[in-house]
Structure formats: C-alpha cells, structure tokens
Regions:
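Bacterial Sec-dependent N-terminal signal peptides
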Residues: 1-24
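Surface-exposed, low-complexity/disordered segments
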Residues: 32-36, 47, 51, 72, ...
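Glycine-centered loop-to-beta-strand initiation motif
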Residues: 60, 90-107, 161, 193-205, ...
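Short glycine/proline/serine/threonine-rich loop/turn segments at secondary-structure transition edges
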Residues: 68-70, 109-117, 209-215, 385-390, ...
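Short coil-to-beta strand junction motifs in C2/discoidin
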Residues: 71-77, 173-175, 704
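Solvent-exposed serine/threonine-rich low-complexity stretches and specific carbohydrate-binding patches
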Residues: 76-78, 88-98, 188-198, 284-294, ...
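Short amphipathic beta-strand segments in non-cytosolic proteins
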Residues: 77-91, 177-192, 274-288, 358-365, ...
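Periplasmic plug
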Residues: 696-712
Length: 712
C-alpha cells in the first residue's frame, strides 16, 4: 500500500508558507466556518425524570463548537419546556455569572403526566439549524393523575382507552367526553360516551394518518371529580424503514463494497431486521442481519447496469427497499482504523487533482494530494483531538466526490474521579461533606468547571447508556441523526464497541455545516446577533398593518431604576433597545412616536417550538411511588393529599374591567420594593417617568407630554 505524507494545515514558523496557506481555498473554507463562532450547549440536570411540583435544577455548559473551549461570546442562554403540542410550559432566560449558567425550572403541581421536551439554546444559535439545539425528552409523572389509570390499545379503525382505579378495577358506566385532534391541532370530532363494562372508551379514527401526531383530549366524571388527560396516538406498530449506506457514499462497479444499513421504527427506535439483497432477476445476492440497534453491514460486489433491492423482515412484518444505484464513473473512500493511524483508499475513478481533506468539528487537520494511479495512504492520528474525523475526497473544483466519518478515541487516557465522604455512615438529616478529586491518566490533578447532582438512589435511577456531556459534545451534537444509547459506545475500549461505533459513523452523515463545494462557502447572513448584554427587539406596525419606518421607541422599567433606553426603528420598522442590565422579572413601559396612525404594540419574535419524541415511563412510575411515601409523613406529621375539586364561582372582589387594562393595588406594588417615588408615580394612570422627567398622556392625541412635578 502506498503511504502518503500528511500535509500540515498551518506550517509553523514559515511566513511564506503561511501566506500560501491563506490563499488555499480549502483552508479559506474552514476559516470561514470558524469565523461564524458556532456554539454548543449542554444541560446537566439533577434528575432524568420528575414529578409534578418538582423543581428541575440544571447547570448549562456553553462551548465553542469547534474547539470545545468555554470562551464563547454569548452571555445569555434560553431554556424552555414544551409539551407535545408545542405549548411552552416554563421558560427562562439566564445570564452568565462567575459560575457559568445555573438555574432551575419549577414544575407546576398541576402539570399533567406525560412527556415533555426540554430545549436550550443561545440567541446566536438561532442563526443555525434548530437540530443542533440541546434537546432532551423529559418524563413527568403526577401522583394525582395516577389515581386513575389509562391504557390504550388499537384496532384498524379505533383507539380503545380503558380507565381503571389505582387498584386496577375498571371504572364502569362513567360519563366521558373526548375530542380528537390531528397533528396540526385541528379538531376532528367531539363525542360523549359512557364507559363500557370493562371501563373502555371507543374513539373512532377516521384515517390512518391521524396516528402520526394526532391526540385525544378526554374528560372523565368519576364520583363528582373531573379527570382530564391528553393522550397522544402512537404510530402503527408495524411501520419501520431501512436505509442503506455504501461506504464512501457510492457503489463502484466491479469493486467489493461494504454496505451499512440502519432500521428504525416509526417512533424512531431501532428495529432488529434480517433480509436479503436481490438483483433485477430476483436472485439472492447476499443475506444480512442486524447486529446492534438495527444496524449492520454486508459485502456487495455490484455490477454495472444492475439494480438491487432488499427484502427486509422484522418479526411477521416485511418491507422492500431499494439500494443506491451503481454510479457510472463513481469513486468511493474505504478506511481502516489502526492504533495511531487511519488507512485509506479511493476506489473507482479518481479525478486528477483530487485531494483528501480531513477536519474535526470544522478545524482542518489534514490536506493530502491523492494520486489517481496510487490512491491510498495513511493519516497519523496521535496528535488529533478526540471526536468525529470527517474525511472528504474533493476534486480539482472543490466538489466532494466521496465522504467518510471516522471516530477518534483516546484509548486508555481517561480522567479519574474520586469522591470521598467525611464519614462512612450518617444519621437522619445530618450534614454530608464529600471531597471530589479529578486526576488525569497519570495521576496529576486537573482543574475543572463541574456540577454535582445528589439524589436518592432508591427513588432515582440513572441510565448509564444515556446521553451525557461527553457523548453529547463528541458525538450527538455533530450528527443530525438520532443515536440510541450513546453512552454504550464510551463505557470502555472494547473492540466490539468500537466496531459498533463505526456503524454509527457509516449510517449518519456530517450535517453541522454544508460541504457541497469546499472552494465556495455558502454565504452566512446572521439574522440574530450575539447577546453580550440584554436587549429588547421587535417591529413597530401601524394600525393598518403596515410597518412604521423610523418610529421612535423608548422603554423604561417600572420596578427598576436606571433601566431604560431609546432607539429609532429602521426602514422596516424593526428596532433594538440595548444596555438593559437587570435580573429577575422586569415590567417595561414602552413609548412609541411615529407619523401617521397610532401604532400597534411592537411585535417580538419567538423561535420555533421543539418537537417531541420517544420516552420510557416505568422509571417514572417507580419515582412517583417514592413521592407518595414522602408525602405520607413530613417531619413526623401525617399528610393527606386531597382530591382536586372544581369551583364554579366568580370572585366578587375582582374588577370586571379598567380603562387601562390593569389594577396596581398595594399588594402588587409591595412586590416592587424598594422603589423610588418617581417610579411609584409611574404606576399612576397616564403617567410615565423617563430620562428624569415626568410625562403625562396627552388628551389631544397619542403620545406623552412633559409635565412639571412639584413635591412638598
């Protein structure tokens, strides 16, 4: 095999070499990627699941997406929790402090049991694909909802919902209402029934597609108590799909090629399959079987002009899938990983002037000329960082002809954690002190920015195969596909695990940034800027619905001093108010001056809501059992959790309406203490204190006029 010399991307101490490097369009491409300052965000949660009324504590780790260093430009992050319909349940905007980003999301005790999506991002990350935001599916249980159990089964035309009490006895002859909605929230029908002798409610499904994202909203009257629940319909159990990925992306005629495959169910989970590859005559060419999480490989020697299809089976289910076509004039990379190096070879027709380019997270680490007569070589990896190495075979115009992902692991070079408590045993409510030590593989102390979660191991069970900060930064955040049980691939350096990790590399593509042409980076025009400080932004729209160009906008905080700013909108009516440094919740009053009609309130932009996905509920049920035990006695006193009731009455003290849409009484004003006299006056109707002046609403038209203030 021919061994190629790896070319350094940045020759040290060579001015002439540095100038030539800057002129290389390949390096200019990756320099352009790094200049966009991409970011990654990971949230360390105190628990993997929660009960209604819990507090979700977390610490966020924000890093540069290329170097994984924490010296990012953003000083604010956004965290929100949404249900499966996309409705935001709780949200926080968090400012960086001396310890980074740490905060919490209190969960309402009335939160229905179900699965929710936790999402975190920065304002700058909105300029990139939402697929690379931090996302995690969170299961939330509710001890009140647990008093009535629901179980759903499906027929070809119905969803059968059975109700039972906490002891499993069916709830018979109870009045129930349900509404059926499609995935877009459109109401399909509403029906009232009485439950059957088995406690069943029968919901007609008008068409198969309703099960893809549709849901049922139910209300059950049991003993004078209204029980409500929303159930999301599950996709057809027999639905699964199989994808095929030739190594290097192409089937080369006459060259044996390793073909990887991945089988997934409709809910995104892997499916174990087996099958056969058939040619155009229906003859079996090769058989295959999944070896790990629906993934596997087989060897295929394709023929020019031949077409191949696969017959795939999962249990009693069977589907047919088509393999990629045999490319005419195709070329494809083949790699083999060995300690400290990667062997590569390009099969097929290699264009003259081709180069092999390698990068890790956008940092170019090698550029190797590829000779079409001897298109093979070696890449040394000892000095490369851990993570996904993306190899691209680019022709003389910069167009990638073949790609391959390889994961680089630092075998046997793991840090060691040691936690030492000050006592072997502790009494009830006794303070626990523990020392935490982090050492490198050589036993030397290592400094770290860390967070620690302490939970009851009888109530909370962690999934050792799930996502953590290492798997997220090195693996999951750089590929767009779903990785099932990512922690499995990092438990040890077993060759079997490394082979299965390579299956993940072969069945997922690099998608953090586009590589259609390495000589011409796609233009990057950010729509959102980096949040170094806090700001308010929006758009001024006139009453006729048109934008209000060059309108003057000002805002002043009603419960903070020296928190105000003014700006002028641009030609499209958009504005930004900056320099607003505050914490906690702040109430702003805005003033808008413009020519023409009185404007509507400024519009503010919200990012798209996240989608939801799969979850596991058994651990949540065990956790709720522990919660019930905790509710039984608190400080030795027995506590009873009462059933929920509905109160159908009107509060006589609540004002029906006001001229200004809000009432500030002494109870509300006491929340803003301490408060200056000037800001106190701002709560008076028609009054506004801004820029050390008192303004009163003008009766002659919209806007404010300056008033004289005398205080005796």
């Amino acid at each position: 095999m021919f061994t190629a010399t790896v070319v350094s991307a940045f020759p040290p101490d060579d001015t002439a070499g540095s100038e030539s490097v800057l002129r290389d369009p390949l390096l200019s491409f990756f320099s352009s990627i790094q200049s966009r300052h991409p970011e990654k965000l990971y949230l360390h949660l105190n628990q993997p699941y929660y009960g209604a009324g819990d507090t979700m504590w977390f610490k966020a780790y924000l890093t540069d997406a290329v170097s994984h260093r924490p010296d990012t430009l953003s000083n604010f992050i956004y965290v929100d929790l949404a249900d499966r319909r996309g409705k935001i349940i709780a949200a926080r905007k968090i400012k960086r402090d001396s310890l980074g980003f740490a905060n919490c999301l209190p969960l309402p005790d009335t939160l229905p049991a179900g699965e929710y999506t936790l999402r975190a991002y920065t304002g700058w990350m909105l300029n990139f694909e939402p697929a690379f935001f931090f996302r995690r599916n969170i299961n939330v249980g509710n001890t009140r909802s647990d008093r009535i159990r629901t179980d759903v089964t499906y027929t070809s035309a119905q969803a059968i919902v059975r109700f039972a009490d906490a002891d499993g006895r069916p709830i018979r002859d109870a009045e129930a209402d349900y509404e059926l909605f499609d995935r877009n929230g459109k109401r399909i029908e509403g029906v009232r029934q009485r439950t059957s002798a088995t406690g069943a409610l029968f919901v007609d499904l008008p068409h198969d597609s309703i099960r893809n994202g549709g849901y049922i909203r139910m209300k059950l009257d049991e003993g004078g108590t209204a029980f409500r629940r929303t159930l999301f319909l599950q996709p057809e159990a027999h639905d699964f799909a199989v994808q095929f990925f030739p190594e290097g992306g192409e089937l080369v005629a006459g060259v044996p090629r390793l073909v990887a495959f991945k089988a997934e169910r409709a809910d995104g989970y892997p499916e174990d399959v087996r099958g056969s590859v058939l040619d155009s005559r229906g003859d079996t060419v090769v058989s295959f079987v999944a070896e790990h999480d629906g993934m596997g490989t087989f060897l295929l020697c394709p023929l020019q002009g031949e077409t191949y299809r696969a017959l795939c089976r999962a249990g009693e289910r069977e589907i047919r899938a088509t393999l990629p076509e045999v490319g005419e004039g195709a070329c494809a990379l083949t790699t083999a990983q060995a300690p400290g190096r990667i062997l590569y070879k390009a099969d097929g027709t290699v264009p003259p002037g081709s180069r092999l380019v390698g990068h890790i997270r956008g940092d170019c680490c090698c550029i190797v000329p590829v000779d079409p007569r001897r298109p093979a070589g070696t890449i040394l990896t000892d000095s490369l960082p851990e993570g996904i190495l993306h190899l691209l075979l680019a022709d003389s115009t910069g167009r990638p002809r073949s790609e391959r992902l390889v994961f680089l692991k630092r075998t046997g070079k793991r840090e060691r954690w040691t936690v030492t408590p000050d006592k072997p045993r502790y009494g009830k409510r006794e303070t626990v002190r523990a020392g935490i030590k982090l050492e490198d593989c050589g036993g030397k102390p290592v400094s770290a920015d860390l967070s620690v979660s302490v939970t009851d191991r009888r109530a909370v069970r962690y999934d050792s195969l799930g996502d953590d900060i290492r798997t997220n930064l090195l693996l999951c955040s750089d590929i767009k596909g779903y990785v099932h049980n990512p922690g499995y691939y990092f438990r040890d350096d077993d060759p079997v695990r490394e082979h299965r990790l390579d299956l993940v590399m072969m069945t997922n593509g690099w998608r953090r940034f586009k590589t259609r042409n390495l000589y011409e980076p796609e233009p990057f025009t950010p729509r959102h800027f980096i949040e170094r400080g806090q700001y308010l932004s929006g758009k001024v729209i006139g009453i006729a619905g048109r934008a209000a160009p060059e309108a003057s906008v000002s805002a002043v905080a009603l419960n903070r001093e020296n928190v105000a700013d003014a700006a002028q909108a641009d030609d499209s009516g958009r504005f930004v108010l900056s320099g607003l440094d505050f914490t906690d919740t702040v109430l702003f009053m805005q003033r808008i001056d413009m020519d023409g009609l009185y404007p509507r309130p400024p519009l503010t932009e919200r990012p798209p809501f996240p989608d939801s996905a799969e979850s596991v509920r058994k651990a949540v049920g065990d956790y709720l059992k522990q919660q019930k035990l905790q509710y039984a006695t608190i400080d030795g006193a027995k506590v009873y959790e009462l059933e929920g009731v509905e109160v159908a009455a009107e509060n006589p003290r609540r004002p029906r309406s006001t001229a200004f849409g809000a009432v500030f009484d002494t109870t509300i004003l006491s929340k803003f203490n301490p408060i200056s006299l000037y800001n106190y006056i701002s709560f008076l109707p028609t009054a506004l204190y801004f820029e050390k002046k008192l303004w009163l609403s003008s009766r002659d038209g919209p806007g404010y006029v300056q008033a004289q203030l005398n205080i005796n």
